[in-house]
Amino acid sequence: MESTFSSPAEAALQREAGVPGLFTPPEDLDRVYELERVTKFVCDLGCQRVALQFPDQLLGDAGAVAVRLEEVTGSKMFILGDTAYGSCCVDVLGAEQAGAEALVHFGPACLSPPASLLPITFVLGQRSVALELCAKAFEARNPDPTAPVVLLSEPACAHALEALATLLRPKYQDLLISSPALPLPVGSPSSQPEPLERFGRRFPLSPGRCLEEYGAFYVGGSQASSDPVLDPDLSRLLLGWTPGRPFISCCPDTGQTQDQGVQAGRLRARRLYLIERARDAHVVGLLAGTLGVAQHREALAHLRKLTEAAGKRSYVLALGRPTPAKLANFPEMDIFVLLACPLGALAPQPSGGFFRPILTPCELEAACNPAWPPPGLAPHLTHYAELLPGSPFYVPLPPPESELWDTPDVSLISGDLRPPPSWKSSSDTGCSALTPRPQLELAESSPAASFLSSRSWQGLEPRLGQTPVKEAVQGRRGIAIAYEDEGSG
């Protein structure tokens, strides 16, 4: 039975991976998993212990890949197949517990910078792409040969973008090819200008050009599941792409295309709704998601400062993977904010849903920072690192005397007038002394006390002075599942 506070330990062992036996033919292992490149990575580092991280859908090949690498490199391989939170993030903690000197991540990845300096390489996979069908679909959707278009893809199809561009370049002059933002080798030459990095991808823009000028042609997904809600990577692109610019998705197997403009509008509309919910909230639960991504401590401190500045109370909850059963134990929270990688924060919610909405840090920033967005720029960000100092999108909080804090606002959900937030120091107790009448009567206003008084059950009744005083006696011994006086029956 699932615990309401933590996932059972047996869940990882009893979960069906869905891929029995060998998934890839032995003769294709070298090509699919890029074993030659992985071998060079291990040999160049001289590692003796290497961790291999596989998602559930690739566990059928994990044993064969590990054996092949051990034979070629002579190093000891450890398979990490029980990632507790999200397989798209690098499991640095698991690799360190195994004593690994390097880590190889297989499968889809968010490509977020890890929190550790452990050497890491990524194998995104190589999904087959029908280049001729995709090229014809591109020409049908882009009749203007001078229109600026950027080629995007899911990580497993990135290997085919250059070949697709070769088929299109004789006709289209303004093509931009994106590539996964993989970690660059140490000491690699940097003679060319550094490309723009966004959405886990690199965009080699020409001088004077910006990404907002381009439309998008995305190769990925499938005909059966074209809903971007089911694909966090596509949702990230749709949220962040410039509104009004075309965004076309293409199935790599059939070449069937779909205009994602309507889906992008739905995602942005939901984000605006969540921002309104955050503005109405008084108590915020900060969910500490994956701890293997860089700057998660700085982001957590930033979110706490943000909620304090907006006059809201925040509580940090470390619950692992969020589930409706876990979060239902905290009815005091008005909203939850998930601090995770972009793919983890935009992952689809389980069936049944949560009783309180789960937001991303970017939505909380838009709700609590009155200076957001910066003038002339309204990006739909998806990664919390873009909110921190050093990012081009960082917007500092206005000073306490700024008029931005005194601007009245009306809730678009309830229709009530929201009072202007007040800047509260960390030493504030959360209660305000009010003197509404000259009788000098003292009244305390506390959000926590107001919520407690509205609950149907407020805890055990103290009954002070109503029960006799007794000497303390020994109570029951054992644990809740089996006390000593209950026997084994």
Curated annotation (Swiss-Prot):
InterPro entries: DHP2, DPH1/DPH2, DPH1/DPH2_1, DPH1/DPH2_3
Gene Ontology biological process terms in this record: protein histidyl modification to diphthamide
Keywords: Acetylation, Iron, Iron-sulfur, Metal-binding, Phosphoprotein
Modification sites for N-acetylmethionine: 1
Pfam families, per database record: Diphthamide_syn
Modified residue annotations for Phosphothreonine: 435, 467
Gene Ontology CC: 2-(3-amino-3-carboxypropyl)histidine synthase complex
Cofactor note: Binds 1 [4Fe-4S] cluster per subunit. The cluster facilitates the reduction of the catalytic iron-sulfur cluster in the DPH1 subunit.
UniProt keyword Cytoplasm present: no
Pathway: Protein modification; peptidyl-diphthamide biosynthesis
Binding positions for [4Fe-4S] cluster per the UniProt entry: 89, 110, 341
PTM sites of type Phosphoserine: 7, 446, 456, 488
Keyword Glycosyltransferase annotated: no
An annotated Gene Ontology molecular function: 4 iron, 4 sulfur cluster binding
Cofactor: [4Fe-4S] cluster
Positions of the UniProt region annotated as Required for function: 398-489
Known function: Required for the first step of diphthamide biosynthesis, a post-translational modification of histidine which occurs in elongation factor 2. DPH1 and DPH2 transfer a 3-amino-3-carboxypropyl (ACP) group from S-adenosyl-L-methionine (SAM) to a histidine residue, the reaction is assisted by a reduction system comprising DPH3 and a NADH-dependent reductase. Facilitates the reduction of the catalytic iron-sulfur cluster found in the DPH1 subunit.
Subunit architecture: Component of the 2-(3-amino-3-carboxypropyl)histidine synthase complex composed of DPH1, DPH2, DPH3 and a NADH-dependent reductase. Interacts with DPH1.
Family statement drawn from the similarity comment of this UniProt entry: Belongs to the DPH1/DPH2 family. DPH2 subfamily.
UniProt protein name: 2-(3-amino-3-carboxypropyl)histidine synthase subunit 2
Species per Swiss-Prot/TrEMBL record: Cricetulus griseus (Chinese hamster)
